């Protein structure tokens, strides 16, 4: 199994660094993406590198529905989006990512395959932890 299944990407870390230095504006996270390229031939999640610039087999990108801060310290933000009934029917989802308003993948994770039934929505949360 992969040691590291989720990561803030290199471009995401670069943007954070430059924003903290006051040299750049940090665009908001606005989209969640799902794909089926997050597992190896044995169905195990592949390790993430941080160098990902997109999902390996991206299937769908949607707007973030909401975000919430986890805990009192507000150092984790949970982003939520839903695969509705009728979306990605029959697909096996194994990777997801967060895109910012400039279209850059800033967070990526892999996981075991999740089958998508036609008549059942699936709600996905992805945490950005600082």
Listing of model-derived features with the role each one plays in the protein:
Residues 1-93, 101-130:
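Small cysteine-rich, disulfide-bonded extracellular modules of the LU/uPAR three-finger superfamily
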């Amino acid at each position: 199994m992969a040691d590291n299944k989720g990561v803030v990407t290199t471009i995401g870390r670069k943007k954070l660094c430059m924003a903290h230095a006051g040299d750049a504006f940090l665009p908001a996270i606005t989209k969640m993406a799902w794909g089926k390229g997050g597992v190896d031939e044995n169905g195990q999640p592949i390790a993430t590198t941080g160098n990902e610039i997109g999902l390996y087999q991206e299937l769908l990108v949607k707007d973030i529905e909401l975000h919430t801060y986890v805990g009192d310290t507000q150092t984790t933000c949970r982003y939520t989006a839903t695969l509705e009934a009728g979306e990605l029917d029959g697909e096996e989802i194994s990777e997801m990512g967060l895109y910012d308003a400039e279209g850059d993948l800033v967070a990526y994770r892999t996981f075991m395959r999740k089958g998508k039934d036609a008549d059942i929505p699936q709600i996905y949360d992805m945490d950005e932890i600082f």
